[in-house]
């Protein structure tokens, strides 16, 4: 395997592993009063890392992350989804958190976000601006005094830009 390969079996296998981990762990994490914000699975020095980002109303503590890590680790050991060595990390999504669900966008209306689209608007795929509105199927954001409506179905990824949202 070349070092640049995303995983044994390629990027599709990484996506499949992420989906399986999400499906396996979401009910248990939800039962703990938390939600999964994002799951990453990638090769880093010295090996593979599985990161599960969780959040709850009021934020998550180090103790919360340790508890969820034990639960997720036990589930993954039993399910045997990943067949080679990896390191599990459970943490808060941080200030510049990813945005995936409509509800997550609704919480940050008026803040600065970044969106990368799957299909370009003209020649543009990257947008950074103030989130103005969240609809059922799309968001509206102001990028340098120009309004863009971006459907959720065209979003590759989106992220809150916490420090860009703070006033001087």
Curated annotation (Swiss-Prot):
Q: Does the keyword Repressor apply?
A: no
Which is one Gene Ontology cellular component term of this protein?
Answer: cytosol
Q: Name one Pfam family in it.
A: DUF150_C
State the compartments where it is located: Cytoplasm
Q: Which GO terms describe its biological process?
A: ribosomal small subunit assembly; translation
Q: What is its main location?
A: cytoplasm
Keyword terms of this UniProt record = Cytoplasm, Ribosome biogenesis
> What does the record give as the function of this protein?
Required for maturation of 30S ribosomal subunits.
Q: Say which family it is in.
A: Belongs to the RimP family.
Name of the protein described by the UniProt record: Ribosome maturation factor RimP
């Amino acid at each position: 395997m070349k070092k640049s390969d995303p995983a044994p079996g390629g990027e599709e296998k990484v996506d499949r592993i992420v989906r399986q981990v999400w499906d396996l762990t979401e009910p248990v994490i939800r039962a703990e009063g938390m939600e999964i914000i994002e799951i990453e699975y990638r090769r880093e020095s010295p090996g593979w890392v599985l990161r599960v980002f969780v959040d709850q109303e009021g934020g998550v503590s180090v103790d919360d992350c340790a508890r969820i890590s034990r639960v997720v680790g036990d589930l993954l050991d039993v399910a045997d989804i990943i067949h080679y060595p990896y390191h599990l990390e459970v943490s808060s999504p941080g200030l510049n958190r990813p945005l995936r669900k409509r509800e997550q966008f609704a919480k940050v209306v008026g803040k600065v976000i970044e969106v990368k689209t799957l299909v370009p608007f003209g020649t543009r795929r990257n947008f950074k601006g103030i989130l103005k509105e969240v609809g059922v199927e799309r968001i509206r954001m102001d990028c340098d005094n120009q309004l863009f409506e971006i459907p959720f179905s065209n979003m590759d990824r989106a992220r809150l830009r916490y420090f860009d949202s703070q006033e001087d």
